[in-house]
Amino acid sequence: MKKNNRLLIVVFAVLALIIGVLKGVDYYRYTKVSKERVSSIQAEFVGETAPSQELSMSMFDVTVYTETGSVYSARSFDIDEKKAPAHGDSFDTKIEYHGSTTTVTVPITRSKVVQYKVGYPTKENVLATIYNNGDLEFTGSGNTMNFANGDTPWADEDYTYVIFKDEITPTNVDYWFEGNTALTGCETLPKSIESARGTFQGCENLKKTPSFFQCSSLKIITDRFSGCTSLEQSDPLPVSVMEAEGAFEDCIKLTKAPDMTKTNALSSINAIFKGCTSLVDAPVIPDSVLDMSEAFLGDSNIYTASAFPESVEDISSAYADCISLEKAASIPASVINCDSCYSGCSNLYGELSINTNTEDCANLLSNAVTSGKTLKLKGKSGRLFEIQQDSGSRYVTIKDTEKAEKNAKKLERQNNQ
């Protein structure tokens, strides 16, 4: 028995010695080759990572190729991304070793919660899948079904992030995510979209719009981000947009309006920035716009009005209750309705050119110009005296009473013909 024990001890000692020698040889070889100039590296992800999980070197196999032809596995290297993103099915990270870099695609492990078939005309062609990390991901290819008034199959599900894969080509996403107060983000929208009415309406925690400038077929964005009270940043409006009524209404944290100058068919921006109380500049309005009613109603931090397009027709309440507004924009002859356009603009002063003879100009300056500074009315309108009297402010005057009287008489003759 004692002999057997001694034999085992000897065997284990020999094995330990062999292992030690092999490790020593391996360490010596590694130390030697690791000093050689690196030609390139290859990396493979061999681990598993969940959303937001920190990455470690043990998750990667990194193979090093030297200029002398040696090949070995790197034991220490730098990983560009320290942890996996919270959303998505994969991400890219860079591996760096001795000045050489390579990019590795890392899959993210998520658990499926529920899945819906929403393709059109074949339902199975597009899948809407909700995962345990809050992703609502659209995969497959082709168009999707239309859903009346936001009656989507995921309406009552819990999700916080929306992802569209490149092959998805929906044309209508009206009210798809309306009222989801937990939604925090959405990646690039499909280029195929034509109508996005109320798509993100009431998504109170959305801070940034998805990229949609590339949506060259998008025509309708009415109420699209209305009530997104955390929204701070927006993509420019695509060239194709025609209707944008209430698109950013009550986005109280939006300080800069999206660029609209690339559009060439935009006709209505009724209430587009209504209630955007943090907006500090009125954006340039495209020449194609005809309806600007309530466009900036209640925007209390705008100081200068943006020029009206020369063909605009409706500017009723366009800048009503903009209490900080100091400089008004000239009212073109094309205007049919300018009722309450500058009503409640208490800080207005300087000059206001009015060139329309429309009868719908009641309350144009009601409760305005009350700060003690003078606003002088001028222009080709025959109704300057009416507008002055209707304002009820002693600080509203006529710049050239003689011209104003001539224009008034001219208008009277035209009306009597």
PLM segments and residue spans:
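N-terminal segments that cap or nucleate solenoid repeat domains
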Residues: 113-161
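N-terminal Sec-pathway targeting helices
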Residues: 1-14
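Serine/threonine-rich, repeat-prone extracellular segments and beta-strand-based repeat modules
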Residues: 47-48, 69-104, 108-110
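Solvent-exposed, low-complexity, repeat-rich "mucin-like" stalks and linkers
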Residues: 34-71
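Sec-dependent signal peptide cleavage junction
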Residues: 21-34
